């Protein structure tokens, strides 16, 4: 084929594909309704303009319930690119007797009228009658389908031609923020009801919510904290992030109108809440301490690990950068899981941390090198910062443990005894960097074999020399050994076993860094 013929063929394909694309129905705005408008902090009714990427299709949707013949609308509004909604001019639910009815369509305000197809009768509010389709509708439909197939083939042929011609296409860098991800399919079809605020933090608040018959946690970010929400969503979406000791991720959504937008992150809900909240109200036994500490260490070790060759891709090493007892959640059986990845940093092969700002996190838990602003921007340096903070969390656990023969302290945050509840950066620098102080390890803790081993582990986690700190994997192994050994130790053997284990049995410090 000559150059002129190729050019003519390309022009023909472009014109055909353009015609096909222009022929589809464009959705610019949809009818908006929210039955839970007060709790979701949105308008109840109105017209919602639909936003999205230029190369993505936009749709309208409606969800409703049929309660003994009475129609209750749950939500109406804009719906992001969904192949199940393509070329539907009418909003029709086709599933057989769903618990919550759902339909989507293309075209301005096409969700104003909706119906339920399998019942062969219109299921709708009386205020939104649906006009029956005339007989020639099916004829028109059968005529359009082949034409659409032909248009699709033409578009594919054009794409193949272009792909073959451009063997090395240029890398395109987005010129604008890609915006929130599309709603999770799991969430989009199900009503999500906010119940009560459980916590407030730096980047928003956490709600207990109901998703059909189960409770979930909804972390709501204001739009100005979009970067934190985006970072947390991206970390949860990495390959291999499903782990027993990492908080289970369910979905992410954008809620509200274009004027008042909130960003939602939906995760599993754990009634016991954070480790910090639990320790305020409860003391822990030696076995409970070991279980919490070991599962927390396992979660952090998995987060720190670089795992190639997973079924869904390569899991990079991840530094949390805000380890604290507030960001460790407890399941009903006291298994710990790591949460809150708004500041997390992933380390992909061949890439450095670059100009990442090092002095982030909660001041009270900042390592000496962070407080000094003297961070080596390499992977292992960031992982060791996490380990310093983990040492402080282990101290919090030890301070509320009943194992030692002595009084159990009231719950206090690390350094609260030294510098109070609201330390400044200068306060932390003075105590941690210049005076090299750490929270007090009580003398009577040393009289319990397990607590004595734990104290040594804590000291090696918060060592002033970052390179001397233990790895998370090493901490997990040590705690397993502590629990096993203390279950067989007698009172007379304490000194002998502590000496033996301290000198011989502990795994090497740098087992995974």
UniProtKB/Swiss-Prot annotation:
The chain crosses the membrane at residues 136-161. ATP binds at residues 198-206, 219. It is an enzyme of class 2 (transferase). Its main location: membrane. It comes from the Eukaryota. The keyword Signal applies. Belongs to the protein kinase superfamily. TKL Ser/Thr protein kinase family. TGFB receptor subfamily. This is Activin receptor type-2A. It catalyses: L-threonyl-[receptor-protein] + ATP = O-phospho-L-threonyl-[receptor-protein] + ADP + H(+); L-seryl-[receptor-protein] + ATP = O-phospho-L-seryl-[receptor-protein] + ADP + H(+). Its cofactor is Mg(2+); Mn(2+). Residues 1-19 form the signal peptide. Disulfide bonds join 30-60, 50-78, 85-104, 91-103, 105-110. PROSITE patterns: PROTEIN_KINASE_DOM, PROTEIN_KINASE_ST. It holds the Pfam family Pkinase. InterPro entries: Activin_recp (IPR000472), Kinase-like_dom_sf (IPR011009), Prot_kinase_dom (IPR000719), Ser/Thr_kinase_AS (IPR008271), Snake_toxin-like_sf (IPR045860), TGFB_receptor (IPR000333). It comes from Homo sapiens (Human). Keywords: ATP-binding, Cell membrane, Disulfide bond, Glycoprotein, Kinase, Magnesium, Manganese, Membrane, Metal-binding, Nucleotide-binding, Receptor, Serine/threonine-protein kinase, Signal, Transferase, Transmembrane, Transmembrane helix. On ligand binding, forms a receptor complex consisting of two type II and two type I transmembrane serine/threonine kinases. Type II receptors phosphorylate and activate type I receptors which autophosphorylate, then bind and activate SMAD transcriptional regulators. Receptor for activin A, activin B and inhibin A. Mediates induction of adipogenesis by GDF6.
């Amino acid at each position: 084929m000559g150059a002129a013929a190729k050019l003519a063929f390309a022009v023909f394909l472009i014109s055909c594909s353009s015609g096909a694309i222009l022929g589809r129905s464009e959705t610019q705005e949809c009818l908006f309704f929210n039955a839970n408008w007060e709790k979701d902090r949105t308008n109840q009714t109105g017209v919602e303009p639909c936003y999205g990427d230029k190369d993505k299709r936009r749709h309208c949707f409606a969800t409703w319930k049929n309660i003994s013949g009475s129609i209750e609308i749950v939500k109406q509004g804009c719906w992001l690119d969904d192949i199940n909604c393509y070329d539907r001019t009418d909003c029709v639910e086709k599933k057989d007797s769903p618990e919550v009815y759902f339909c989507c369509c293309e075209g301005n305000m096409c969700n104003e009228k909706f119906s339920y197809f399998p019942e062969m009768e219109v299921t709708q509010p009386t205020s939104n009658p649906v006009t029956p389709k005339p007989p020639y509708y099916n004829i028109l439909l059968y005529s359009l389908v082949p034409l659409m197939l032909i248009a699709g083939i033409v578009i594919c042929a054009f794409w193949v031609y272009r792909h073959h011609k451009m063997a090395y296409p240029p890398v395109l860098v987005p010129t604008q923020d890609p915006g929130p991800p599309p709603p999770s399919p799991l969430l989009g079809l199900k009503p999500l009801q906010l119940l009560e605020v459980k916590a407030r933090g730096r980047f928003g608040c956490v709600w207990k919510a109901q998703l059909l018959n189960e409770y979930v946690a909804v972390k709501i970010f204001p739009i100005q904290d979009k970067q934190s929400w985006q970072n947390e969503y991206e970390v949860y979406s990495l390959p291999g992030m499903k782990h027993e000791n990492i908080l289970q991720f369910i979905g992410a959504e954008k809620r509200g109108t274009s004027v008042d937008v909130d960003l939602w992150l939906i995760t599993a809900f754990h009634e016991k809440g954070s480790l910090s909240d639990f320790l305020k109200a409860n003391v822990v036994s030696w076995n409970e301490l070991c279980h919490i500490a070991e599962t927390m260490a396992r979660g952090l070790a998995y987060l720190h690990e670089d795992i190639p060759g997973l079924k869904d891709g390569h899991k990079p090493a991840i530094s949390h950068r805000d380890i604290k007892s507030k960001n460790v959640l407890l399941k009903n059986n006291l298994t710990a899981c790591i949460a809150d990845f708004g500041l997390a940093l992933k380390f992909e092969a061949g890439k450095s941390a670059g100009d990442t700002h090092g002095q982030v996190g909660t001041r009270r838990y900042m390592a000496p090198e962070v407080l000094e602003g003297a961070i080596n921007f390499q992977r292992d340096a960031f992982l060791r910062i996490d380990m310093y903070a983990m040492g402080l969390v282990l101290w919090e656990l030890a301070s509320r443990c009943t194992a030692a023969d002595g009084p159990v302290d009231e719950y206090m945050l690390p350094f609260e005894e030294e510098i109070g509840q609201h330390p400044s950066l200068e306060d932390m620098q003075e105590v941690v960097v210049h005076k090299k102080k750490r929270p007090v390890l009580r003398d009577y803790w040393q009289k319990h074999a397990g607590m004595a081993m734990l104290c040594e582990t804590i000291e090696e986690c918060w060592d002033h020399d970052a390179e001397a700190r233990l790895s998370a994997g090493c901490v997990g192994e040590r705690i397993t050994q502590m629990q096993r050994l203390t279950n067989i130790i007698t009172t007379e053997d304490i000194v002998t076993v502590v000496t033996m284990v301290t000198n011989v049995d502990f795994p090497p410090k740098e087992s995974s860094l």
